[in-house]
Amino acid sequence: MIIIGHPWISSPKFCKVFSAADIKKSKAEDIVLLEPLVDSHTLASHCRQNQISFAVTVNTLQEAIFANALGATYMVCEEDDALIIQPIAQEYLFDTRVLTLIHEEKEITKIARSGIDGVIFPEAIC
């Protein structure tokens, strides 16, 4: 299970960007976070063409399918959406990992039992 943003575990920062200029300002070790996909698909293509790791927030299965097709490293979603997306991601062998946004450590076990790829704490998002 992937755990991002917990103080015990070293993990990259996910930095929100809204333009190609923001992407250029980001650190090489950061994961570029695009949101929402409908407004950032050109930035996703830019990241893919330039081999920049990126994540995208998704709210629907359709957005998740597009995020994977665009080459996102991660997709970030709420638990309810993750429960719908994860089985499809496994069935179609998505390269993109599904992360659920959580606020408390005790939620990790519940997400793990649901078979979701991982969790991300808000502290990991800048």
Residue ranges, per PLM feature:
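Solvent-exposed alpha-helices and their adjacent loops that cap or buttress functional pockets
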Residues: 25-26, 91-92, 112-113
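Active-site-adjacent beta->alpha loops and helix N-cap segments on the catalytic face
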Residues: 34-47, 77-94, 106, 126
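Extreme N-terminal leader/targeting regions
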Residues: 1-2, 117, 125
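Catalytic cores of alpha/beta
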Residues: 61-70, 103-117, 121
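Conserved N-terminal beta1-alpha1 strand-loop-helix module at the mouth
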Residues: 1-69
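Glycine-rich beta-to-alpha transition loops that act as phosphate-gripper elements at the mouths
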Residues: 36-37, 54-61, 79, 98-107
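Glycine-enriched alpha-helix->loop->beta-strand junction motifs that scaffold or abut catalytic
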Residues: 48-53, 70-75, 95, 113-119
